[in-house]
Amino acid sequence: MIRPARAFFPLLLLPVLLTGCDADKNGGTAADSADLEAAARGWGVAPELVYVTKVSGYTVFQQSVGEYEDEFAAVYRSEKGATTFGLFVSRGKLTAESCSKQPLGEVSDTAVTCEHDGDAWYRKAGHSHEYAVPDGGVVIRLTADADKVDRAILRKAAEAVHRPDDTELAALLRTTDGVDT
């Protein structure tokens, strides 16, 4: 009888081992909730609004991270600093019916065009364009000047958007020595 008990023991561990699987589709684990809540409180936003993205050649500009008009906001800049795109997260929904009715950033007097692209919406108005990604009651917007950042960069940013892990959360926080990374 001891032999079947030994065979059964590893099966008992299986749920424990699988608990951490797929915690973050980008390979890390979600940031500790207490750390995320403290950071969000410091920025003046709700923790569920904090998202990050990853695009080769771009890094987050730490001084830009925080609250902007009740949204979470962060600016990503190119390694050379010549181009930027913004990541904005707010509560709400974006549907085929509402897409063109919602203004695109500061552009309110120009018609917004919408194109469904995978799980996101590609939106354009004047010289601004963005990818808007609905995700469980929030909308993540990746916005840039269409003349400076091409659509492919914004699409990559939209595809990579996710909740931060501990390392990514630390990268959002301003360093204490006054130097950003």
Regions found by a protein language model. Give the residues of each.
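C-terminal motif of bacterial Sec signal peptides marking the signal peptidase cleavage site
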Residues: 17-20
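Short, solvent-exposed recognition patches
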Residues: 28-128
